[in-house]
Structures are given as structure tokens and as C-alpha cells.
């Protein structure tokens, strides 16, 4: 029997407001435990929440960027549950009137494009963070309590773990472009739960779903779903039954582990939040927020191809993160050739960042520095090979490329007379290579070029070396 996989994702995104959603407490990551709290966050008796307008506008902007319909009338509700990181014993969320509904984003997997629906986007407050220290007790940090969140719930349109990965990458990219969140999973500003079920191919009715938690990276989401897909198929093929349960992904063992079995759907006893009035969002407000949405990744990708002449692959890679795309924009604004700038960012820059596990804002390289280095290559002052030495200094220490070239004596040798001396000397010592080349062995010329580059410590102008080599060989 063949099965079809059905996946839905729930993504929580912390909004990058200065203060929390219902209090004036600072909304900054990295403070000492329980430093960014107030009596409102901690649920003291008699205190009242005040809605943060910036959080509403950030949620509106995200909803619009995700092609959602923004509600004209919305409200907040109490979601009731007991847990140590929830001091009020309820969470202020949105139940039946979310701020955004019926959205979609387009993903691409293996060259095939597909729309993934978004059921809803709603605003809510985050809970605190528990740290299980062992020895029979846990610690709770309420700094995160009251942080504004949007929860984005996808339609069950995702059919493979690869599509889930692509959806998350695209969602993160769009949200980052709007500026409403930095979406840093390592800081908890983007978190994801996944629901997965299997059904026989052709069956309309969904199978029993399993919820996956502890998915700390997009790669873990993909791996967790791949494992769960195989596990459920094995259970069904052996005549077993899938239970509605919550499982966590164990990255060390690369498998999912049972957390708890769900007897039925959770009953949170939602009811309207009595301390907050309903929210009306008029057309003028919506129009203002829509006008503030910047160029999004798909539009920027299209512009890179149509106006800058970049290959579609380059445009896709460059626009995947706003940080990289903005860096590229600034580099070409400083005069760098778009294709050369793209090559360096996708090659040497990305390679260095991946190897060092760093972000662009954590290195010394600037768009101005990269642009000037590229211009030195274009002018023939340095070769691409020498540029890699300059680049290492630029990304680790910064500075002016021209000054680095002068200080290290890296100026490319382009004087024909000087180069010809090296060419003649190498040819005098390598008669066999000359004979090989004349006998049709084209690789011999590569060897001779290599010898000249070695003699000049990589500073010879490659096109000129090739030209002079052919001239001198033809004389012999």
C-alpha cells in the first residue's frame, strides 16, 4: 500500500517591538533572568493590560506580506491552562477572530512551484521559559513572558519534509524582509511545531496526526518529519494504529520520542478577554501599513534577473536572507559589477561564514570594501587569485583593499616586458612541455602557466601570460 504524507506547520514568531504586547517592559533578548518584567507580566491582582499598537501593526504587516486578509474587527481571548511558566494561569491570545486569515506563500522544490495556504495568523503573548536544573527543581525566567508573538498556521498542503523545509525558509525570508522579526531560532524568536499524518493514496479523509516538538532548526524539522513519515508507514503496514500523540525530536538519536498521548483535543476554555476592548482596523489604517511593506524576496529576485541580468539561481540564493540581499544591493551601489559581486558573495563570503559559523554583521567585511576589491580585479590591478588573499584581510580585519594590496606587495604584474622575461625563462627550462603542446596536448599550456604563476608568486596577469606563452612557443 502506498501512502500520502500530510503535513501542517505552526510557526511562532516573536515581534521585534521595543516593549511587550501588554506592558511597558523592555522586549530585548539576553537580559539577566527576570530583569525585563513588571506586575502586568507577572499577573499581579488588579493590574490591567494595555495593547501595544506597534505589535498590532507588525502583525498586520506580516499578514499582508503573507497574502492574508486582514480583519476589520478582531478581539483577544483568554486561553486557560496551568503551567509554571504561565503566571496568570491563562494566556491572552486570539481564538475565533484572528487578525489575519486565508493567506498563502509560494515555494519551489526541485524546480516545481507550489502554493501553500495559510489558515490564520493571530497575535498572542509568549510565556516564560523553564530551565530544568535537576535535583528536583526547575527555574523560570519571565523575561519572555508577554513578548508579542504571531502564530502562523499553515493549511495541511505540505506533502513532503522537503516542502516543509522550503516553506519555513520562505516564511522566514518574508518575515525578515518586513522587519517585524529577526527570526533567530537560536534565540527563540522563531519556533516551529509540526503535525504529520499518513493516508492511503487517493483517500480524502486525513489520517490520525502526530505533533512534533523540540524542532530547534529547519534541518531538524526536515529530519524529524522524515523519521516520523517512515515510523508511521511501518506501523500502518504492520497492521497497527497511529495514536494521536505529541512526540519530540531527539537530534542525537535522529528519531522522534513519545512525550505524551492525547486523549482528545485540548480544552483551553477560551472566552473573550474582559480587560481589552475589541479592535477595529479601518481601511485607512490598512492602507498605511500596506504602503510601508518593503520590496519582498520574490519581487527582488525578479528584479535581479530582469534588470541586473543575474541567473535565476544567483537571484534565489542572494534573496534568501535580507541580510545577504541588502549587502549585495549596497555593494553594487558602490560600483561593483553585479555578477562579480554575486559570485563573491555566493562563493568566498558564504564559504567563510559557513566555516566560521558567523553572520555578515559579525565580520569586518563591508559593501564598500568588497566593491573596491572587485574594482581592483576589473582594472587588472590584482588577479582573482590574489584577490582571495586581500579578501581574507578584509573579512577578518577590514581596511581599504588598495592599501592592503600596496602593503603586501600584491599588485598584479601586467608589464609585458617583465612578464616576457618570466615566460622565456620557464620555456627555456621546459622543452618537453613545449613539444607536448605542439603535439596536441593542450594540458601542457596549463602546466607552463602554473610555473609562471609560481615564479611570480601568483602576481602575473593570467590573460597576458597565456598570450605571451603562445607568442613565444610559436617562435620556437
From Swiss-Prot:
Pfam families: GatB_N (PF02934), GatB_Yqey (PF02637). PROSITE patterns: GATB (PS01234). The keyword Zinc does not apply. Signal peptide: none annotated. InterPro entries: Asn/Gln-tRNA_amidoTrfase_suB/E (IPR017959), Asn/Gln-tRNA_Trfase_suB/E_cat (IPR006075), Asn/Gln_amidotransferase (IPR018027), Asn/Gln_tRNA_amidoTrase-B-like (IPR003789), GatB (IPR004413), GatB_C_1 (IPR042114), GatB_Yqey_C_2 (IPR023168), Gln-tRNA_amidoTrfase_suB_CS (IPR017958). Allows the formation of correctly charged Asn-tRNA(Asn) or Gln-tRNA(Gln) through the transamidation of misacylated Asp-tRNA(Asn) or Glu-tRNA(Gln) in organisms which lack either or both of asparaginyl-tRNA or glutaminyl-tRNA synthetases. The reaction takes place in the presence of glutamine and ATP through an activated phospho-Asp-tRNA(Asn) or phospho-Glu-tRNA(Gln). Heterotrimer of A, B and C subunits. HAMAP family: GatB. This is Aspartyl/glutamyl-tRNA(Asn/Gln) amidotransferase subunit B. It comes from Halalkalibacterium halodurans (strain ATCC BAA-125 / DSM 18197 / FERM 7344 / JCM 9153 / C-125) (Bacillus halodurans). The lineage of its organism: Bacteria, Bacillati, Bacillota, Bacilli, Bacillales.
